[in-house]
Design a protein with these regions (language model features):
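Active-site-flanking segments in enzyme catalytic domains
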Residues: 4-186
Length: 186
């Protein structure tokens, strides 16, 4: 196995020292590509299978069947069609552009995405707790944030039940398990 194929090591990003592009934009684009590719690598052959819920599978399903999606307006469908055309039907490139808008604009409460892509990104690429608390006052995000909070609390409850069962059986929580719990609690 090549070192670049190992999934259990930390990610490393390299950026040029001299560049004409804004470094923040470059980092956001790189993180979007990284999120897409790491999800593909973790999911394996099921990265595009909607039965296995993941960032890539839901986003591919959304882009493949946008014409039949009743949640999208005619204008949103036309924008997505143009985005797919500009990206030469490369779903990753469309995702990266949406991810850039998500981080740069939507995190500040400025609407750039349609309802479906916003919902997918909130599920798999949520904002920090501070940003989520700021956005709760915004009516466009209230439903999404409430749904996210419910899903998070269910995950925490499920993890705590497994951990309690593990402790009762004589197990001891190591640092990785505690970090995992902290991740779901944020």
């Amino acid at each position: 196995m090549c070192i670049r194929d190992r999934r259990d090591t930390s990610a490393r990003f390299m950026f040029p020292v001299f560049t004409a592009v804004d470094l923040e934009d470059m980092m956001i684009e790189t993180m979007g590509r990284y999120r897409w590719e790491i999800c593909r690598k973790i999911q394996g052959v099921h990265w595009n299978d909607i039965r296995e819920k993941s960032l890539t599978s839901e986003y591919c399903d959304y882009m493949q069947f946008y014409r039949k999606n009743f949640e999208l307006s005619a204008d949103a469908k036309e924008k997505l069609k143009n985005a797919l055309f500009r990206a030469k039907n490369n779903y990753r490139e469309v995702f990266v552009k949406d991810y850039q808008n998500w981080i740069k604009y939507e995190s500040r409460g400025s609407y750039r995405l349609n309802k479906v892509s916003r919902q997918i990104l909130m599920t798999y690429c949520p904002f920090s707790k501070e940003l989520r608390n700021e956005l709760k006052a915004n009516p466009m995000y209230q439903e999404l944030l409430n749904r996210y909070d419910i899903q998070s609390s269910r995950s925490v409850k499920r993890i705590l039940a497994v951990y309690d069962k593990y402790k009762r059986a004589g197990g001891e929580l190591n640092q990785d398990l505690r970090d995992n719990l902290l991740y779901y609690q944020m």
